[in-house]
Amino acid sequence: IKNHQSKQIVVFGVGDYTNSREDVHYVKCVSEDELLEKFLKFWETHKPDVITGWNSKFYDLPYLIHRIKYRFGEDAVKRLSVWKTVYKDSVYIQGKEHICYNVFGLEQLDYLDLYRKFTYSSQESYRLDHIAFVELGERKDPNPYDTFREWYTKDFQSFIDYNIQDVEIVDRLEDKMKLIDLILTMAYNAKCNYGDVFSQVRM
């Protein structure tokens, strides 16, 4: 998790991680249950209004919700919402169903969606690695193993570094492109919710 204003990063993990950065706070946990509980307490304390990520709408948030639900049950998922209301939804893209969630009181501005809608350019790939190279001239660290699970279990240090890099790339994209700033301004001028900016009809 990275705060765009303060630039501080908080990382939750189950394993030993050597942290040498002042802008990174590593929260070591002994189990997945402890990690999820500490994450939920962090979330409830800071109460984010807007979150972003690269394909976070269809991957990061659904994965997180599925793990919380599996470990703690449906009621624990409601802790992500200031209104204690979370709805499951589905969207069909090119004939394939994608699961997403509506967390009341939280606006999800997926940076992949923002980039596709507001850059008015067509890319050969919308993988974060490619967009980072096009826009920032940098590449993501490659996975040195066959699977992410293997990477996680065999080299936890570089695996965490990789995840931090993911967050920082999205943050640097926003520093350069100001797409979230654009959304906030458009929503303010149109007197609509942030997510409604994606729909011309609602605006």
Give the ranges of each region predicted by the language model:
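Conserved RNase H-like, two-metal-ion catalytic cores of nucleic-acid enzymes
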Residues: 1-50
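Secondary-structure transition/capping motifs at alpha-helix termini
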Residues: 2-6, 45, 70-79, 180
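Active-site-proximal helix-loop-helix substrate-binding element of RNase H-like nuclease domains
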Residues: 21-26, 61, 70, 75-167
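Amphipathic alpha-helical segments that form well-ordered structural scaffolds
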Residues: 38, 63, 131, 169-173
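Short glycine-rich phosphate-binding loop at a beta-alpha junction
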Residues: 48-56, 186
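A short acidic (Asp/Glu
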Residues: 56, 61-67
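Short secondary-structure boundary/capping segments
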Residues: 65-75, 187, 203
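Common nucleic-acid-contacting/processivity interface regions adjacent to the catalytic cores
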Residues: 149-203
